């Protein structure tokens, strides 16, 4: 049985009595305003979650079936979040959904900087019927964000802010100083006694402080309005010396002309963030847990950090706090959109945007952590130029209604990078601010990069409905990318969907308790370019050493990639069928979706012979993977009165992933990869030297499964000691810990089932809301317990209190 991960959030607040729960409201709006062929999900964050929100991604968490938001790193505010829409669809390709903010192509990092108070709504596109319109960028789903604009109600101003504190909820229960000494003496082991009783978690942690402020004002009339907002956040994390600051500025203006036939939308968005971190946070906590507790918290009388030379895997935690890993990111984008009603049913739209980003990173590792020290500086810049033009037509005659859109767009990107690394620090006082004062430049430590990919697209869609009851929609998008090979420059991504509004049929028209009943199905294809760069298809070279030619040092070059003229994007085909049901005036609403998707032409890197090839690796489109599942959403309004209202919303998703194949043909050559490949291993003392892999990629299994030796317990040896009794699973008389040896599949690392629920209750102006998120059907490997209960590393390394038992 899998582990259960449960998140419970309870918030109290005061708000206007006119607000109703967003999910019920949005489901009603969705069913009333969109075609029965669609399965879009709209989320309005100002109503869904109330109380403090750290960033826009907090709004998405638990709100939509099949959409999982997780945090990478120790600091959930400063580190990048991960979003998966209906699971993992690729090994080497991108798995992040495409993010569109006010029509501007963006990414999750930028989305995480937007203040929730600036967001009008989210729209989540999951099925290929919808994502096919984004072609080669839509295979992992699409998240469209619409930010707030001017209301035209005259001048308005708003402010919201909050202060908060944070601390570690739970510490590892490690041996203290006296317990450490007593255990070592009881076991007859030699140990170092520094004479202290230090809790090294207290050395590296503190009570964190966060405060954020958001100011917005808007004004104007219905024909000409604006909205501007400013946001600031300062977060001192629970790790000493770590902090994160973010400043956001946003401006939007809308202008109408020619009696509203021409509408112009102009927007500017910019943010600047600074992160002060250390070089390796994982090593910091590992060192704090494993350090000898009898050592001092600071330096000795000579100013040196006390360390057991036998404990080579760790450093003094206090010394690690002097590491630096500082980042500064600036982002600016602006857009202009125009819509002109040529005729009452014919609209010409044009949109253009420009985005600029700059990221600087500086790292410093002092000589008391690394013998020669280490300094790194890097600067990365990016520019995006985007434009599209579309023509939309709609018309109704008799019982028929037709909507049609044709368009074209072009995206040009420029990416540059420059970085340098050095060792041999003259003095730690320079930190990373004087690389010239270092004595050693590692080969390959200084380099630069450049790429300028482009994407040109044409698209069209048609939706026809009869009697506002039967609907059919078809779409086709063609993409031409500079990153794929000449043989596959263009790719085409079609979709078709059907919808039936059953409630409007005669046999249900008199059924009063059913308010809505709609059925839909669809099929579509989308692409994935995430695993390809501007140089992936080329036989590229790279410097591989320095030799002396005629007495002059000369850099030699060598191949690092084979040419593949047939390389192209991955293709994901999806079939879905679903329904929406509302009863008792939509007081109870059910929505469900069943889907199956298959990724083909999956990118993977294969071993190839040399000299047949110039390099021993070849990336090719051969593998395949499937995802299937069912999603369920339930919304209930058990109480709905003037002064009292209660809303209950629940969503659940079951998802099954399977790696189907990694073998196939390439130009008459059979290409194959190992059926079992390690993708995750243990790290730490006692876990090196091989046989420490725990997570695997196995053909025929979900991507990321635990494949482990089976321990039956303890067995006594001839000397009266005990050792682990490992089962010989293949009955060959030997215990083999290697990959594919005596191991069994112990479970998968990703959840099979995820749930999200929101319960809100309002009485007059008092509201209370509760959110519960959960994940089921997966396993969590307790590497922490394995590392800190291993008595073979004691007393050089610290262990947990229960380990000696």
Residue ranges of each PLM-predicted region?
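Extracytoplasmic gating/loop element in the C-terminal half of outer-membrane beta-barrel translocons
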Residues: 190, 481, 775-805
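Short, small/polar-rich motifs associated with maturation and membrane association
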Residues: 1-257, 262-271, 317, 331-333, ...
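Extracellular/periplasmic, surface-exposed regions of secreted and cell-surface proteins
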Residues: 3, 208-211, 246, 252-258, ...
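Acidic, glycine-rich flexible loop segments
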Residues: 212, 282-317
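Short aromatic-centered micro-motifs
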Residues: 99, 464, 729, 761
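Low-complexity intrinsically disordered tracts that form flexible linkers/tails across taxa
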Residues: 275-289, 659-667
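Conserved small-residue
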Residues: 158-193, 421, 620, 637-749, ...
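Glycine-rich, aromatic-lined ligand/substrate-binding cores of catalytic
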Residues: 748-783
């Amino acid at each position: 049985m899998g582990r259960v991960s449960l998140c419970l959030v309870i918030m109290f607040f005061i708000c206007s009595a006119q607000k109703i729960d967003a999910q019920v409201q949005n489901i009603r709006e969705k069913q009333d305003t969109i075609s029965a062929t669609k399965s879009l999900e709209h989320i309005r964050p100002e109503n869904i979650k109330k109380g403090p929100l750290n960033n826009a991604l907090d709004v998405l968490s638990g709100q939509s079936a099949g959409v999982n938001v997780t945090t990478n790193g120790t600091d959930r505010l400063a580190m990048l979040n991960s979003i998966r829409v209906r699971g993992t669809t690729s090994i080497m390709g991108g798995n992040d959904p495409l993010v569109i903010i006010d029509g501007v192509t963006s990414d999750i990092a930028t989305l995480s900087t937007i203040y929730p108070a600036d967001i009008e709504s989210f729209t989540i596109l999951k099925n290929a019927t919808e994502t096919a319109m984004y072609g080669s960028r839509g295979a992992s789903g699409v998240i469209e964000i619409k930010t707030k604009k001017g209301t035209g109600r005259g001048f308005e101003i708003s402010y919201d802010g909050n202060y908060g504190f944070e601390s570690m909820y739970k510490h590892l229960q490690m041996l203290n100083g006296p317990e450490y000494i007593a255990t070592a003496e009881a076991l007859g082991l030699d140990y170092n006694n520094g004479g202290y009783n230090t809790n090294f978690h207290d050395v590296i942690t503190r009570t964190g402080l966060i405060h954020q402020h958001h100011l917005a004002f808007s004004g104007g009339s219905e024909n000409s309005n604006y909205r501007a907002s400013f946001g600031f956040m300062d977060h001192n994390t629970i790790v000493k010396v770590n902090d994160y600051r973010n400043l956001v500025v946003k401006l939007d203006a809308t202008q109408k002309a020619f009696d509203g036939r021409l509408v112009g939308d102009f927007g500017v968005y910019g943010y600047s963030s600074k992160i002060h971190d250390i070089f390796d946070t994982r090593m910091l906590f590992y060192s704090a847990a494993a350090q000898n507790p009898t050592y001092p918290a600071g330096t000795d009388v000579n100013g040196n950090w006390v360390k057991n030379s036998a404990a080579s895997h760790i450093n003094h935690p206090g010394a690690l706090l002097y590491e630096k890993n500082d980042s500064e990111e600036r982002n600016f984008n602006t857009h202009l959109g125009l819509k002109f009603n040529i005729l009452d049913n014919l609209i010409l739209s044009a949109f253009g945007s420009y985005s600029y980003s700059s990221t600087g990173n500086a790292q410093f590792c002092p000589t008391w952590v690394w013998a020669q020290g280490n300094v790194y500086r890097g600067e990365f810049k990016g520019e995006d130029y985007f434009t599209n033009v579309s023509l939309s037509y709609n018309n109704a005659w008799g019982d028929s209604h037709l909507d049609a859109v044709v368009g074209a767009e072009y995206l040009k990107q420029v990416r540059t990078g420059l970085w340098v690394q050095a060792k041999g620090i003259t003095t730690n006082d320079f930190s990373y601010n004087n690389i010239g004062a270092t004595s050693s430049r590692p080969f390959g430590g200084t380099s630069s990069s450049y790429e300028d990919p482009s994407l040109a697209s044409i698209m069209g869609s048609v939706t026809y409905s009869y009697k506002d009851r039967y609907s059919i929609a078809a779409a086709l998008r063609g993409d031409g990318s500079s990153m794929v090979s000449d043989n596959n420059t263009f790719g085409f991504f079609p979709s078709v969907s059907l919808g039936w509004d059953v409630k409007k049929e005669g046999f249900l028209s008199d059924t009063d308790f059913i308010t809505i009943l709609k059925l839909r199905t669809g099929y579509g294809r989308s692409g994935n370019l995430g695993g390809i760069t501007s140089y992936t298809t080329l036989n590229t070279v790279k410097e591989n050493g320095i030799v002396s030619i005629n007495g002059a040092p000369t850099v030699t070059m060598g191949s690092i990639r084979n040419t593949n003229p047939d390389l192209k994007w991955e293709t994901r085909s999806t079939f879905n069928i679903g329904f929406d049901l509302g009863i008792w005036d939509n007081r109870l609403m059910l929505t469900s979706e069943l889907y199956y998707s298959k990724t083909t032409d999956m990118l993977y890197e294969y071993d190839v012979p040399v000299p047949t090839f110039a390099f021993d690796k070849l990336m090719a489109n051969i593998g395949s993977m499937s995802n299937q599942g069912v999603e369920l959403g339930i919304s209930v309004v058990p109480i709905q009165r003037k002064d009292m209202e209660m809303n209950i919303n629940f969503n659940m998703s079951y998802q099954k992933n399977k790696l189907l194949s990694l073998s196939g043909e390439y130009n008459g050559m059979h290409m194959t990869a190992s059926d079992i490949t390690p993708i995750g291993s243990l790290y730490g003392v006692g876990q090196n030297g091989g046989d420490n892999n725990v997570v695997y990629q196995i053909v025929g299994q979900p991507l990321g499964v635990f494949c482990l030796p089976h321990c039956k317990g303890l067995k006594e040896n001839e000397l009266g000691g005990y050792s682990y009794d490992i089962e010989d699973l293949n009955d060959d008389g030997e215990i083999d810990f290697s990959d594919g040896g005596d191991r069994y599949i112990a479970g998968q690392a990703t959840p099979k089932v995820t749930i999200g629920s929101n319960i809100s209750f309002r009485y007059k102006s008092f509201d209370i809301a509760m959110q519960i998120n959960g994940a089921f059907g997966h396993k969590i490997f307790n590497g922490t317990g394995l590392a800190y209960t291993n008595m073979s590393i004691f007393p050089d390394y610290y262990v947990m209190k229960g380990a000696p038992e």
